[in-house]
């Protein structure tokens, strides 16, 4: 039984989700860009076999990432940390305290970031056809070519406007083993997942994906699966994840395609179910104090403080300091951080989109401006 579509609120964005199945634990499914929570269950799309299998032994929470499917549109400037926090918002709305998180494709790095950021909310991680970094660099040769991707982004609108069959071609590329019924259903899902403009915006945002630095902070049971002949996400991406997440189990399947058809999904689904049941049985779900925490440490100080204090005098300088303190406190509340060591040292777990490292304190009445210098860094 699948619930009606519901909405979680993440900041000011509404995130569509559905819940299905029952079981001793929850699974949160984080899809790729081709997502639509209603069509995914109502049409014979290839991944429907996944949802039905997961719902046979667990409670499944499936959502559309912001900018896709039935969720709100997204600003092209939205960073991965903000998008990642949608997972937490959906879990809260669905009443899920802890869950196994399954990330598909570009939902994978979001899931990995969530697991590192919220070790108290995720007890297991499964990554399918995922990547640690989107673009290719000398130290990461498996990513996409940025110039080619930008060229493809520029032609998205024209391609979808003049070649509607392109979506069916994309469905065949993604799922070469699919039946005609599955291919047509998948093309329909792609068509309803995003408008051409939204697809271009999401592709631009994905160019910034790089979670390599957070992988060592993942300390929960992790399974990484990848098809050897994945045409969309080169297999080196999966191998990298398997090598750089501590204790991860890596399973490489000698298959074609990015998405398995219902007929070929058996081995991967068996591996995922066995992994989750085993991790659950071993007590991975039990809460424990994490030995590593992913956090951002932010230091602030007012540039030229001595000169400002002299120029303003004690009373006005105290007002400026109070304005600085209030501004910083508001940012901490906004991003769920906490204050450490008076006003100079601020610590927050990476719970939301990172606080921009440019806070300014203004003396509006006197027309003066004191700049606030910040220094930040991640600690894991």
Regions found by a protein language model. Name each.
Residues 248-289:
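Catalytic active-site module of serine/aspartate enzymes centered on a nucleophile-bearing elbow/loop
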Residues 7-70:
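Conserved HGGG/HGGXW glycine-rich cap/lid loop of the alpha/beta-hydrolase fold
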Residues 112, 116, 122-158:
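Flexible "cap/lid" loop of the alpha/beta hydrolase fold
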Residues 285-366, 375:
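Catalytic NTP-binding/metal-coordinating core of nucleotidyl cyclase/transferase enzymes
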Residues 159-205, 214-215:
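Conserved alpha/beta-hydrolase catalytic His-Asp/Glu region
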Residues 231-237:
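Conserved alpha/beta-hydrolase "acid-adjacent" motif
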Residues 81-99:
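Conserved acidic catalytic loop of the alpha/beta-hydrolase fold
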Residues 218, 224-226:
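Short beta-strand/loop motif that positions the catalytic acidic residue
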